[in-house]
Amino acid sequence: MTARIIDGKIISADLRGRVAAEVTRIKAEHGITPGLAVVLVGSDPASEVYVRSKHKQTQEAGMASFEHRLPADVAQADLLALIGQLNADPAVHGILVQLPLPKGLDSNAVIDAIDPAKDVDGLNPVNAGRLASGLFALTPCTPLGCIIMAKQVHASLEGMNAIVIGRSNLVGKPLVQLLLNENATVTIAHSRSRDLPALCRQADLVFAAVGKAEMVKGDWIKPGATVIDVGINRTPSPDGGKDKLVGDVAFHEAKDVAGAITPVPGGVGLMTVACLLVNTVRAASAIHGLPKPGV
């Protein structure tokens, strides 16, 4: 058996198209243009790539895109002052501060300063608490993308046994809450869990978000299970060439056991920016008291 490939390129393109349609409708019916502000501190090359991608896709969806670039040695007070300005700006419905921040800046204080209504990264404690309480919340983008991808295979996740490997605030913890909201039965595990392979073999859904290259082996997977691989790890090429990207799952082993699996690259990573656009449209609708959009 060879697993079905859950293609992030196709799914994210469809989602971006649906977002663009919602933006067009909101503009036509209400005269509102959803706006996303991205704050980049310093000049980290990887962050530069992400910011350019976000800017491009935001504009392609018909939304307003605002970029704010600050030097790596910016004072914490100046960064917080900018966030305060964006919180008060009616043209801005979503605020994203590109992480990680340079040394010397307090990421938690920055996240706390973002208006929860504009927190499109879903990291503000207010949104985390609302999600845990089963209330409407802006949800971290990667877990949201994971759920959308799982639902490409299963119309309903209700009653399914799911394991989430990883307990980060960015992925693992919010993903558990989203799965509980879907009425799945959830086990949360991590690199120090006892007999992790046995836990995985019980799962209909495996979400790997532990940040260790190819840690999850093919014989950990229950035959026919759906595997969502969140990991993005650079490993040296065996022939000494360019480094290659691999996930947290040993793809070439797992694809012969799983029923469906996301590749790396070409999987969950492509969903993250698409879900950022979803959150921006949802935030704009909530801020203006509009019905929840159809994305």
From Swiss-Prot:
Catalytic activities: (6R)-5,10-methylene-5,6,7,8-tetrahydrofolate + NADP(+) = (6R)-5,10-methenyltetrahydrofolate + NADPH; (6R)-5,10-methenyltetrahydrofolate + H2O = (6R)-10-formyltetrahydrofolate + H(+)
Any one Gene Ontology BP term: purine nucleotide biosynthetic process
Keyword Oxidoreductase: yes
Pfam families: THF_DHG_CYH, THF_DHG_CYH_C
Binding site for NADP(+): G166, R167, S168, S191, I232
Function noted in UniProt: Catalyzes the oxidation of 5,10-methylenetetrahydrofolate to 5,10-methenyltetrahydrofolate and then the hydrolysis of 5,10-methenyltetrahydrofolate to 10-formyltetrahydrofolate.
Protein name: Bifunctional protein FolD
